[in-house]
Amino acid sequence: MKKSLLSAVMLSSIALTAVGSPIAAAADDFDSQIQQQDKKIADLQNQQASAQSQIEALEGQVSAINTKAQDLLTKQDTLRKESAQLKQEIKDLQERIEKREATIQKQARETQVKNTSSNYIDAVLNADSLADAVGRIQAMSTIVKANQDLVQQQKEDKQAVEAKKAENEAKQKELADNQAALESQKGDLLAKQADLNVLKTSLAAEQATAEDKKADLNRKKAEAEAEQARIREQARLAEQARQQAAQEKAEKEAREQAAAQAAQTQALSSASTTTESSSAAQSSSEESKAPESSTTEESTSTESSTTTENSSTGSSSTESSSTEESTVPESSTQESTPANTESSSSSSNTNVNNNTNNSTNNSTNNSTTNNNNNNNTVTPAPTPTPTPAPAPAPNPSGSVNGAAIVAEAYKYIGTPYVWGGKDPSGFDCSGFTRYVYLQVTGRDIGGWTVPQESAGTKISVSQAKAGDLLFWGSAGGTYHVAISLGGGQYIHAPQPGENVKVGSVQWYTPDFAVSM
């Protein structure tokens, strides 16, 4: 009996042990998975905290840039005051110069009529005594020295004013360059912050467990990625604008160099022709005194030389005309060739005029031929086919209602300037233009000046119409932007301490415009 009971107890123990071991193993496995998940969540939280720290560091850099910008703008304000003071000094100096101008001119005329040495002699000879003579000489010396000092002082004052103006302009250019660099740096920081926002939302999406929260985070991630892509596209367009500006500058320098070389070649050719013509004329005059046979031979030689020179002159004139039509203005290339004799001048002018007339006639004939060919081309009229009335199409991309843009911009007259501001609580120049276009068209033209250069077609300031953008600075390195009102006016957020207002190109002239 006891043995049977003992066997039953042992059998039960074995059975319980067999069942409990898998349960314990499963519990241990769950604990391990929970620990792993906790570790993963902790790692994600650490990564998210690190990303947040980087974002905060970048925000600190943006704040530092804001401070630097404020310092630069304060310096600009100081420079404007110094410039105003300098203008007043120049005005006062000019008034003093005008008051003394009559006296200086009178003394200059007297000095030309009577030289100083004779005046001194007259003073001595007409003196009543030796003391009188000495007094007169001293008085004349004092007057002459005073006049010389006066002229010298005026000269020194003018030089000092010019030096101050040059220094002031250099400082203003330096500040403009610094502002352009700040705009570029602001764009880089925005791009980095967008990248970090993508990282942060990605980590948050991995950490989220609830589907609704995860979906919301994924949406934010998609928005951040879209913002990242937009800023990268803006950076690409900005780089493209910089490269295009550099290419245009290189092409302009090449054209100017070619024009300078052409002008130099023409000048050398004209000088050579003048020298040879003068030598030929002088030689003919001297040889006319020789015997008849010698005169005949030398005259023949002179005529041949003159004919060759005139041909060279005509060729040079033709080349100069061709160069003028392609690259160089007329005023910078045309030079008159002086002649020492009537015959050489008449011959040269005749050849030049003939070449010019021939070139003009050829151009006219070609133009007439082209016009005739164009007029002879007849395009058959297409057969009209009835079509249903189309539905009104939206404005194409790049076509903007200028009146609507201007009306929206006028709503924010008086809004204070805030560097980096992008809403009606405060605008900077590019934030103002971006906000206005976003409200009217729903289009984001970029958060700083350089991407906004690529928002349309580059045109001259005189071609700008209402609603177009006006830029200050070179393409790819602009530092200010405004909205054109037409008629030489624009609306912009100017600088700290001022509000959104209307300005005029007469007082603050932009460098180029972009047609929207």
Curated annotation (Swiss-Prot):
Gene Ontology process terms (BP): proteolysis
Protein name: Protein P54
Coiled coil: none
Annotated Low complexity bias: 237-247, 257-380
Similarity comment text for this entry: Belongs to the peptidase C40 family.
Covalent S-S links between cysteines: none
One Pfam match: CC_PcsB
Start and end residues of each stretch annotated as Disordered: 208-397
Organism phylogeny: Bacteria, Bacillati, Bacillota, Bacilli, Lactobacillales
GO cellular component: a single term: extracellular region
Bias-annotated ranges (Pro residues): 381-395
GO MF, one annotated term: cysteine-type peptidase activity
Main localization of the protein described in the UniProt heading: secreted
PROSITE patterns: NLPC_P60
Annotated keywords: Cell wall, Hydrolase, Protease, Secreted, Signal, Thiol protease
Domain NlpC/P60: 399-516
